[in-house]
Design a protein with these regions (language model features):
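Alpha-helical transmembrane segments and their immediate juxtamembrane cytosolic regions
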Residues: 1-405
Length: 405
């Protein structure tokens, strides 16, 4: 019986390329959104609705955690799941610290080279360069973060909690989701958040609120979505979803065309604002759900285009989300200082934007090729104990995808 259970746990997990596709698209959007006043950024989601790539990444991460580790925990291998998820959290922590050091060095070097201290202030590294002895400790504690480095601490927190979330979802899925919703409401009501640096500030992504998206996604991943599938894709639900998407589009257009704001009743403006990203405003949450309903309707799992050469570049980026995200942070700042120091013309904006995406694709291709090269240090004989064997199961590499502001 143990051998049978172990074999079931080690069975290959069929990859859903849609998740890689949307993560890849999200990585491109993050890169473009981080370039101030970039004309190409008008292609990104945040300009046409309440949600953006952040919701996509957190949902995909939570869904994969539930989908991959739900059967593992249900099979009695909780410690194996905990070990792998905590190891992944440690990898992300190391990646965050390395990204922090290199990104800060890039900003400092650029500021010195062009004698332009604006970069140090704009990206919140001036205090670090002035007092590195104090702020390096704050950075290690995930309190001090330069601009655009807020997301990995959120993921680290969620992944550390993921084994216990999955354990609860496997046993009491609806009760766990209800507890998550209660924590979300209490956090918003009493302003619960994690302290940041300088004193008096808090995390840009409030984990007590963003956990709702993660837990809901994991709830779907452990199989609960199948119980409401008919309701989710009913005509009524899809009609409400498209109406909500249209409403969000109209509201967001008032941000870009101020003349349209006069068409929105004052009581409605008072009711919906502010649309808070830090605490995951419910308008953002529901907008993402409405979008997800229609996207999954038009892009089924067996969509043939997922296997075409045209979508291969963006899928490759999605399959290597952590390193590509880190690379995108450097590239977006590089594009920013190029446009700031030299020119902000439309053609130059197009050039740096597409050059950055091409570099991201190239890096993803190299990472993919590197994974296909046989290791020079393969153990010829290896007898795996059950818990070690679980470690050899398909890794949730996609379960940890970064997002952005």
């Amino acid at each position: 019986m143990i051998i049978k259970d172990q074999a079931a746990l080690l069975a290959p997990v069929e990859r859903d390329l849609r998740l890689d596709l949307f993560r890849g698209i999200g990585l491109w959007m993050i890169f473009l959104d981080h370039i101030p006043q970039d004309v190409v950024a008008w292609l990104t989601l945040r300009n046409y609705g309440f949600s953006d790539a952040a919701e996509f990444f957190v949902f995909i991460s939570g869904y994969l955690v539930g989908w991959i580790y739900g059967p593992v925990v249900a099979g009695g291998w909780f410690l194996a799941a905990l070990k792998r998820l905590w190891r992944r959290a440690a990898e992300m922590y190391v990646a965050h610290i390395m990204l922090f050091l290199l990104f800060t060095a890039q900003i400092a070097r650029t500021a010195r080279r062009f004698d332009n201290p604006m970069y140090e202030h704009e990206f919140n590294v001036f205090n670090f360069l002035s007092h590195p002895d104090e702020l390096i400790g704050q950075a290690i504690l995930l309190k001090y973060k330069p601009v655009n480095l807020d997301v990995l601490p959120l993921y680290i927190t969620l992944v550390l909690a993921a084994p216990f979330i999955v354990w609860c979802l496997v046993r009491r899925p609806n009760l766990t989701l209800a507890a998550s919703a209660l924590l979300y409401m209490l956090s918003r009501r009493f302003d619960w958040n994690i302290a940041s640096y300088p004193p008096g500030t808090t995390w840009y992504f409030n984990p007590f609120c963003w956990q709702l998206m993660f837990v809901f996604a994991a709830w779907c991943g452990v199989g609960q979505i199948d119980k409401i599938r008919k309701w989710v894709w009913s005509r009524t639900t899809m009609t409400v979803a498209v109406a909500w998407l249209v409403f969000a589009f109209v509201i967001v257009m008032t941000w870009h065309v101020h003349a349209l704001e006069a068409l929105i009743p004052k009581w409605m403006i008072k009711a919906i604002y502010p649309i808070d990203k830090t605490d995951l405003d419910m308008l953002r949450f529901t907008h993402f759900l409405a979008l997800a309903i229609w996207v999954t309707h038009f892009v089924p799992r067996k969509w043939k285009a997922l296997h075409t050469v045209w979508l291969r570049p963006v899928i490759l980026c999605g399959q290597h989300s952590l390193p590509i995200f880190c690379l995108g942070v450097f590239l977006s700042f590089s594009a920013h200082w190029i446009l700031t120091q030299y020119t902000k013309g439309v053609w130059e904006q197009l050039a740096v934007s597409f050059a950055g995406i091409i570099i991201m694709i190239g890096a993803a291709w190299l990472l993919d090729r590197a994974e296909r090269v046989p290791s020079l240090f393969v153990k010829v004989t290896e007898v795996e104990e059950p818990d070690v064997a679980i470690e050899s199961a398909p890794a949730p590499a996609a379960a940890l995808a970064p997002a952005s502001r």
